[in-house]
């Protein structure tokens, strides 16, 4: 019996990757990179939307209250007066120049007409004109000054519109040691 001889061959070199495989692998890297970037963008957008949504509902303390109209009782409590041309041409009224005209209907006041002079700013209007305005808004049509007192959200203290600025809020709440920043969600 003869033994078959087996020739030992050297191991063949590993096959070289084809150009098609290299192109497919680089395409896969590009696709995965694009998907990762898209995922990061969606996560960032979701975080911004969530922050804006939460801030909208939690920052109510610092945002100004909506300019709602005055109630009937407050409207009736505003002083009425009768216009006279002799009074309007003297003193500070003559310096302003606009106290003889209603800024809403743009007509001059006539002698004996009933007018309202707003207490905080001193602007004058026909009673009918300003009453229609103040039913839907609580500010002066000329200077936009709020006519109703603003209540503090923390303690309920009523203040005039001039005191609503940031400095007053800090002075009013000096006793409060904890301040919650509104920029945090």
UniProtKB/Swiss-Prot annotation:
GO terms for molecular function: ubiquitin protein ligase activity; zinc ion binding. It is a single-pass membrane protein. The chain crosses the membrane at residues 29-49. It catalyses: S-ubiquitinyl-[E2 ubiquitin-conjugating enzyme]-L-cysteine + [acceptor protein]-L-lysine = [E2 ubiquitin-conjugating enzyme]-L-cysteine + N(6)-ubiquitinyl-[acceptor protein]-L-lysine. Its main location: membrane. Expressed in stems, flowers and green siliques. Pfam families: zf-RING_2. Changing residue 104 to A: Impaired E3 ubiquitin ligase activity. SUPFAM superfamilies: RING/U-box (SSF57850). Keywords: Membrane, Metal-binding, Transferase, Transmembrane, Transmembrane helix, Ubl conjugation, Ubl conjugation pathway, Zinc, Zinc-finger. Residues 176-185 have a biased composition (Polar residues). It is found in: Membrane. PROSITE patterns: ZF_RING_2 (PS50089). Auto-monoubiquitination. One of its GO terms (cellular component) is membrane. The RING-type zinc finger domain mediates binding to an E2 ubiquitin-conjugating enzyme. This is Probable E3 ubiquitin-protein ligase ATL44. It comes from Arabidopsis thaliana.
């Amino acid at each position: 019996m003869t033994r078959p001889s087996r020739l030992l061959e050297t191991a063949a070199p590993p096959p070289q990757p084809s150009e098609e495989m290299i192109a497919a692998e680089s395409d896969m890297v590009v696709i995965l990179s694009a998907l990762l970037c898209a995922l990061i963008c969606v996560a960032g957008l979701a975080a911004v939307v969530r922050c804006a949504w939460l801030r909208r509902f939690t920052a109510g303390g610092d945002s100004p209250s909506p300019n709602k109209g005055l109630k009937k009782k407050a409207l009736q409590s505003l002083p009425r007066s009768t216009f006279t041309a002799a009074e309007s041409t003297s003193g500070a009224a003559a310096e302003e120049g606009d106290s003889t005209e209603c800024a809403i209907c743009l007509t001059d006041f006539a002698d004996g007409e009933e007018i309202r002079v707003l207490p905080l700013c001193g602007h004058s209007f026909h009673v009918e004109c300003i009453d229609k305005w103040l039913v839907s808004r609580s500010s002066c049509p000329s200077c936009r000054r709020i006519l109703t007192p603003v209540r503090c959200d923390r303690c309920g203290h009523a203040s005039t519109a001039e005191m609503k600025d940031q400095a007053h809020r800090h002075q009013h709440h000096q006793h409060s040691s904890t301040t919650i920043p509104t920029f945090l969600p």
